[in-house]
């Protein structure tokens, strides 16, 4: 369940980055995300209930970008 959520957050961050670059049109393709999870702090010594979770997500994506700077014939 965490993997799709993390992938969406990465997509959202990259989309904001793309929108902030003028005169370039980019499309994100072929994202491959890996994640791992571990407990950072246990509620008790029995390791039964995790109090603090650590999630690491690493995504590799391909960006296809075209320069669309002012090329009009006006």
From Swiss-Prot:
Its main location: secreted. GO terms for cellular component: extracellular region. Residues 1-26 form the signal peptide. Disulfide bonds join 26-50, 33-59, 39-61. Keywords: Antimicrobial, Disulfide bond, Fungicide, Plant defense, Secreted, Signal. GO terms for biological process: defense response to fungus; killing of cells of another organism. The keyword Membrane does not apply. It is found in: Secreted. Belongs to the DEFL family. This is Putative defensin-like protein 12. The lineage of its organism: Eukaryota, Viridiplantae, Streptophyta, Embryophyta, Tracheophyta.
């Amino acid at each position: 369940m965490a993997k799709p959520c993390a992938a969406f957050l990465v997509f959202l961050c990259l989309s904001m980055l793309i929108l902030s670059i003028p005169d370039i049109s980019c499309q994100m393709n072929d994202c491959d995300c890996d994640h791992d999870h571990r407990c950072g702090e246990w509620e008790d010594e029995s390791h039964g209930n995790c109090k603090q979770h650590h999630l690491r997500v690493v995504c590799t994506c391909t960006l296809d970008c075209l320069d669309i700077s002012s090329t009009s014939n006006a």
